[in-house]
């Protein structure tokens, strides 16, 4: 378990220097700036991915994950519309190219209408600027697409996609990490939002148990779901199965019908207890900050806000490491599956439905954990 840096769409010299100054080794990119030709092809290209990975490595960093592609790359897949086969072929080739380039994780979502907020300049502590959401202001929004969609057809579309993309992901050693819907409400813009609660994530993992299928555990979204309740239970359930591939660590005040993103140390959850729980269940992936408040004189990327969040997470990590040392510290990066050999087509392997299993901590280590972790706040299950 380690802290990384991410939510960046370009590996500028300034960003790479910032990462090293924070003492981090791993980089995640989110919806990176696409070359003009890639915008037309609708897929991630091998040479572009290789250039990104090489640029990070030249500065002593690892490009560990690419998260998200433009919604237009797979909107027909999500909605079950004509043309989805063409988009599927492009997404399959994108996965192959990630594997060929040695980038082991692809973070994805199934949110055809995107992230919604009803307030983008919400003042929080000390006048910092954040964002917020109120269901009351969004529930009457018009259809985002051509009609109103129902939940079961969205599940059918999701199953169709996963059945066809996961065998490619397994062949090329690329793990697919599912992000929750944000906000996690039943429907917005006429389209159901499937990944809004524990039961639906459980359904997705059970229906597609391939070892390459897991979670981008966005703590902020899980905190939104029930006002902070249930976060530890979800981390324990999916973490013990080895289904949490990496973590977005942010927090909110409130629940899914009315919440405000806040500083990481003042939200619904006790972040220390969350990270301790992740260590307890054997999580060995990386944790990054996520959305951060915009501080005075901050940059567009939010360097000040991110330095605050990353420093906070690093300090907690240090304490967690002291209270429960990793019994196999050399394996901290071994959790990232070995990438396919560069530019060489790997052998086809029979798909496996067995998730990776992590050895639980010893009884002595468990006894050292805090009892009855406290979660602040509350909310109704949606």
Regions found by a protein language model. Name each.
Residues 29-30, 70-73, 140-144, 179-183, ...:
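Generic detector of short, locally flexible boundary/turn motifs and exposed helical patches
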Residues 2-4, 9-11, 16-20, 57, ...:
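Histidine-acidic metal/acid-base catalytic patches
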Residues 27, 35-36, 72-73, 114-115, ...:
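Short secondary-structure capping/turn micro-motifs that flank functional sites
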């Amino acid at each position: 378990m380690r802290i990384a840096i991410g939510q960046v769409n370009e590996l500028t010299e300034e960003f790479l220097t910032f990462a090293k100054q924070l003492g981090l080794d791993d980089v995640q990119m989110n919806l990176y700036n696409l070359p003009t030709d890639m915008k037309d092809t609708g897929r991630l290209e091998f040479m572009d991915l290789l250039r990104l990975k090489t640029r990070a490595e030249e500065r002593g960093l690892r490009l560990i994950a690419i998260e998200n592609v433009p919604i237009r790359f797979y909107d027909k897949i999500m909605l079950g519309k004509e043309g989805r086969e063409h988009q599927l072929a492009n997404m399959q080739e994108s996965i192959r190219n990630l594997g060929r380039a040695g980038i082991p994780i692809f973070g994805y979502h199934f949110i055809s209408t995107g992230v919604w907020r009803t307030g983008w300049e919400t003042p929080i502590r000390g006048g910092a600027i954040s964002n917020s959401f109120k269901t009351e202001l969004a529930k009457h929004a018009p259809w985002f697409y051509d009609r109103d969609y129902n939940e079961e057809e969205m599940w059918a579309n999701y199953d169709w996609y996963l059945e066809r993309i996961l065998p490619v992901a397994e062949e090329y050693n690329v793990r697919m990490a599912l992000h929750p819907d944000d906000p996690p409400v039943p429907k917005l813009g006429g389209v159901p939002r499937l990944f809004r609660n524990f039961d639906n994530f459980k359904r997705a993992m059970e229906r597609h148990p391939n070892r390459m299928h897991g979670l981008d555990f966005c703590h902020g979204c899980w905190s939104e779901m029930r006002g902070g309740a249930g976060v530890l239970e979800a981390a324990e359930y999916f973490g013990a199965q080895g289904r949490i591939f990496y973590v977005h660590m942010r927090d909110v005040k409130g629940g899914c019908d009315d919440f405000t993103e806040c500083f990481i140390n003042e939200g619904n959850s006790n972040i220390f207890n969350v990270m301790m729980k992740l260590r307890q269940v054997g999580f060995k992936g990386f944790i990054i900050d996520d959305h951060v408040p915009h501080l005075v004189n901050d940059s567009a990327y939010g360097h000040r806000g991110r330095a605050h969040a990353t420093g906070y997470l690093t300090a907690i990590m240090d304490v967690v490491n002291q209270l429960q040392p990793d019994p196999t510290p050399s394996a901290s990066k071994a959790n990232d599956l070995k990438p396919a050999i560069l530019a060489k087509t790997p052998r086809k392997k029979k798909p496996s439905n067995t998730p990776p299993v992590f050895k639980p901590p010893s009884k002595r280590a468990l006894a050292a954990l805090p009892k009855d972790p406290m979660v602040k706040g509350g909310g109704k299950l949606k």
